[in-house]
């Protein structure tokens, strides 16, 4: 794919003022409980403070490219994919050490990091910070270029809203659900740097005082403006960047503005964003590989292989059966046992409870979901002439009745 520059620094910065009012498609609802506020008051993530701290970096980097293009000539000649892959390699080293720590903590081991390892991790973190802005620029360029090829925008021949991202670690998310049913009752953004022991402490305190199911989870991205994107694999990073842009785009459409109306519309938004992000990412990957190799597709598990999707779906079904019977303690004991099973099979799930299923269930393509939205939207996408045609069909939805008419 030919990479062309579609970044317009000044335009992006002006648009920021507009989109700031709509930032954050994941709700950060104020708690009615004074007790809960006192528990999490020092851990809350402030979107406004983050914007004020981060925007100047983005502003000066964009201005420097605009005013002093020759200063960045050597960097600009680099392949954007190469820039992103280099960042991913550094990030993978940090994730490797963090995973070792998380696994040891979940298993209850006494994990003490030595000073030498901390120095190594800090070295990688410093490298990430040095490469952050150029990597963001590369991602914005690639995704903008691809969206333009798909002819998706509010205005003709213009990417609107412009793709603008931050690859700083997204905030974590406190998720609350009733114990007697799986329901996304409340979500609150927390700081990204809370430790695993801190998470257990906050969750335990809330569960005992509020009688709720609580979970603090990492998230893949947040549709602020700039959107926050968690860097993982190349395909995943492209997918998440496109996913968050989809939310920014939908802010200007009835579907996006209906996000909080009910759980069904939220699921439609998130699932459509996943379909969009995955298709954009696959297209980029196919171009990069010159169509010489096919993207791996998921196949049904063969016994005696452990199939995460099937096992998680079975877990969700069984938990709901217990809860429908009013047997909360049995459901919670079952989830504890299943969490240990997943951990033994190499899937690092720190905590499996009602809040876990309430959050992951809004993504209908997740094995944690019981929704039919993914199958319905996938069928609609397959019946559409193009990705742009698919988006035009769904962007004006604002209620469940219109959705049902569309997918019939």
Place the predicted regions along the sequence by residue.
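Alpha-helix initiation/capping motif
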Residues: 58, 76, 193-195, 233, ...
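Charged, low-complexity, helix-prone segments enriched in Lys/Glu/Asp/Gln
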Residues: 2-4, 9-12, 127, 138, ...
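Sequence-level detector for tyrosine residue identity
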Residues: 54, 61, 87, 101-103, ...
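Solvent-exposed, acidic/flexible segments
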Residues: 80-83, 87, 230-239, 266-270, ...
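Acidic/His-rich structured neighborhood in mature extracellular/periplasmic domains
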Residues: 93, 102-298
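N-terminal low-structure segments adjacent to metalloprotease catalytic domains
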Residues: 1-150, 384-408
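Pan-zinc metallopeptidase signature
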Residues: 303-408
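Generic, low-specificity signal for short hydrophobic/alpha-helical stretches with a mild N-terminal bias
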Residues: 72, 76-79, 184, 223-227, ...
